[in-house]
Amino acid sequence: MAKWTKFPHDNSGFQYTAATLKKNWARLHRGDCEPFPKDDAVVQAWIAFHAGDFEKAATLGLAAGPDGHNAANKAICIYANYLEKSDKKKLELYQEVGERCEALQAADKKNANAFYLYAYAMGRYSQGISVTKALAQGLGGKVKEALTIALKLQPKHADACIALGAFHAEVIDKRSEER
């Protein structure tokens, strides 16, 4: 993996131990409804994520196997969206997350965040190649379906609800530009 840009802000308020992460988990994951991990290695990945150490979170999450993939995928998506400077690298990262999410969906059909993070990654990928091109490749339907499944699995998944609304708004906006 190429060198990652470090999180540029003070993160001292987000330094957690396993115990303090568990205590704050519901507040930190209100939007994505991610369940608190059972595996200590995955807990460490989430500790790194919340501290803004996205590279470490990705590395630890991937090393933990499928149980750590939501932490890794979220870390990679947030990193790509906010810190990665290369558009080409962003697209590569989003594609990698999308592929990993598809495998995770097949292995665990009840993992709402495997569907949500797929939609996030492919939605951002679509924006990078242009929404019109993405729709032509069928990504629009796949993103919408993934968000719909995430919401069926976890109706209180606020992030998926917001993303589905944004998806509809962007598709309508792009379609109206074409006319």
Model-derived features: positions:
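N-terminal alpha-helical interaction modules that lie
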Residues: 1-115, 121-128, 132-154
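Conserved alpha-helical positions within TPR/SEL1-like repeat arrays
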Residues: 116-117, 162-163
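Short, structured loop/turn "capping" segments at alpha-beta junctions
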Residues: 156-161, 175
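Conserved small/polar residues in nucleotide/adenosyl-binding loops
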Residues: 178-179
